[in-house]
Amino acid sequence: MALTAEQKATIVNEYGRGENDTGSPEVQVALLSANIDGLQDHFKSNKQDHHSRRGLIRMVNQRRKLLDYLKRKDFERYQSLIQRLGLRR
């Protein structure tokens, strides 16, 4: 479910614009996507966990807001990110 420090560091290195870049929209979206993927696996075996489902919906909404911001500010970075994460088909 939750990401380990090593997993977070790997995501930051892969999607960050610099060495210690944890605040850029790309990194935030990538971290949220990893958390969302983990929760989706959790819900396959725990269908009645509505409390965690609320957290999942909150993460999805936050990711959507960050993607909208990135699309508005720098469309090329947005396209690159969704292609790398495989979010749109």
Curated annotation (Swiss-Prot):
Q: What GO biological process, any one, is recorded here?
A: translation
Q: Which domain of life is it from?
A: Bacteria
User: Is the keyword RNA-binding in the record?
Assistant: yes
A single MF term (Gene Ontology): rRNA binding
What keywords is this UniProt entry annotated with? Ribonucleoprotein, Ribosomal protein, RNA-binding, rRNA-binding
What Gene3D superfamilies does the database record attribute to this sequence? 6.10.250.3130, S15/NS1, RNA-binding
Gene Ontology CC entries for this record: cytosolic small ribosomal subunit
Q: Which SMART domains match?
A: Ribosomal_S15
Family according to the record: Belongs to the universal ribosomal protein uS15 family.
Instruction: Provide the assembly information.
Output: Part of the 30S ribosomal subunit. Forms a bridge to the 50S subunit in the 70S ribosome, contacting the 23S rRNA.
**Annotated function:** One of the primary rRNA binding proteins, it binds directly to 16S rRNA where it helps nucleate assembly of the platform of the 30S subunit by binding and bridging several RNA helices of the 16S rRNA. Forms an intersubunit bridge (bridge B4) with the 23S rRNA of the 50S subunit in the ribosome.
Q: What's the name of the protein? A: Small ribosomal subunit protein uS15
Tell me what organism the protein belongs to.
Chromohalobacter salexigens (strain ATCC BAA-138 / DSM 3043 / CIP 106854 / NCIMB 13768 / 1H11)
